[in-house]
C-alpha cells in the first residue's frame, strides 16, 4: 500500500519535512517513490505539488493524519468531521451513562405524574 507521509530532514531540533509517497512498510527516512511537497512547522510554510498529489490520491494512496490535515488546508481534500482523538473512550462512556440516567429520571417523573393523575380520577 502506498502512503503519503512526512520525511524528516534538516538540522537537529530544526526539523523540516518533505511530503513523500512511499511504501507503507518502508522506513520514515527511507527512499521514497516520489517527493510531493514540503512542510516547515516552524514557519508554517507549505508547498504542494498538486498535480502529482492528485495522481497519487486517485491511485489509492492513503495519507497519514498530519498529511491529510495539510491537504485539507491546501484544498486538495474535503474537510471531514472526524471525532477528536483527545476524547477518550472513558469520557464518552461517562457521557452515555449520564444521558441514560437523565432519561431514566425523566421517565420515572412522568410515570409518577401519570400515576397521581390516575389516582385522582
From Swiss-Prot:
Alphabetized UniProt keyword annotations: Ribonucleoprotein, Ribosomal protein
Keyword Ribonucleoprotein: yes
Signal peptide: none
Ranges of biased composition (kind: Basic and acidic residues): 100-114
Entry keyword annotation includes DNA-binding: no
HAMAP family per UniProt: Ribosomal_bS16
Protein's name according to its UniProt entry: Small ribosomal subunit protein bS16
Organism this protein belongs to: Prochlorococcus marinus (strain MIT 9312)
Taxonomic placement: Bacteria, Bacillati, Cyanobacteriota, Cyanophyceae, Synechococcales
Amino acid at each position: 500500500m502506498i502512503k503519503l507521509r512526512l520525511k524528516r530532514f534538516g538540522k537537529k531540533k530544526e526539523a523540516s519535512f518533505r511530503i513523500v509517497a512511499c511504501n507503507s512498510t518502508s522506513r520514515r527516512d527511507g527512499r521514497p517513490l516520489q517527493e510531493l511537497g514540503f512542510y516547515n512547522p516552524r514557519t508554517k510554510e507549505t508547498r504542494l505539488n498538486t498535480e502529482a498529489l492528485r495522481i497519487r490520491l486517485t491511485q489509492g494512496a492513503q495519507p497519514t493524519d498530519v498529511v491529510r490535515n495539510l491537504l485539507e488546508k491546501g484544498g486538495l481534500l474535503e474537510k471531514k468531521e472526524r471525532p477528536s482523538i483527545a476524547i477518550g473512550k472513558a469520557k464518552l462512556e461517562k457521557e452515555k451513562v449520564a444521558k441514560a440516567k437523565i432519561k431514566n429520571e425523566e421517565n420515572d417523573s412522568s410515570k409518577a405524574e401519570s400515576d397521581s393523575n390516575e389516582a385522582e380520577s
